[in-house]
Design a protein with these regions (language model features):
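Acidic/glycine-enriched connector segments
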Residues: 1-151
Length: 151
């Protein structure tokens, strides 16, 4: 990951009504924070909306890159780079991680290595919420900045 980077985390069942707020956060991270790489998963509505917001922003900011996070080894579960994405990323060391926790572990790896986190998580009994809390705890250790989108 090069330059300033940002990861998205949110609930799978997110309402599409959050899109405008999400797009505004993407644009803010590009213009105010100098983010050039956005990393997103592909397992739910929030991930789809986050990817759509970055794809829309790329029309105005062509230097911005959109990267798809792969929690499963590409040889085991091949996924071609989707339209609008610039690349895929499979975190190193994930080969021995059990499939059951691969998504959680891949997400945590990315949180440990990005500069910014845009989050939309409100349900305390969820992996998304736990990852946001993890990011908040990491904030002082690795200078991660967390943006929480309001419901």
């Amino acid at each position: 990951m090069n330059g300033k980077s940002c990861f998205f985390i949110g609930h799978r069942e997110t309402s599409e009504a959050i899109y405008r707020t999400l797009y505004a956060a993407v644009e803010q991270h590009i213009l105010e924070y100098g983010v050039t790489e956005f990393i997103v998963g592909h397992y739910g509505v929030f991930d789809r909306l986050a990817a759509s917001a970055v794809k829309a922003a790329k029309h105005l900011y062509p230097d911005v890159k959109l990267i798809l996070l792969l929690p499963y080894h590409p040889a085991e579960r091949p996924i071609p780079t989707p339209d609008g994405f610039d690349n895929t990323f499979y975190p190193p060391g994930m080969e021995s991680v059990p499939r059951k926790i691969a998504i959680v572990r891949a997400n945590r790896y990315v949180v440990d290595h990005v500069d910014y986190l845009i989050a939309y998580a409100w349900h305390p009994a969820s992996n998304a919420w736990e990852l946001v809390e993890y990011g908040r705890r990491r904030k002082g250790q690795n200078h991660l900045q967390v943006t929480i989108l309001k419901r």
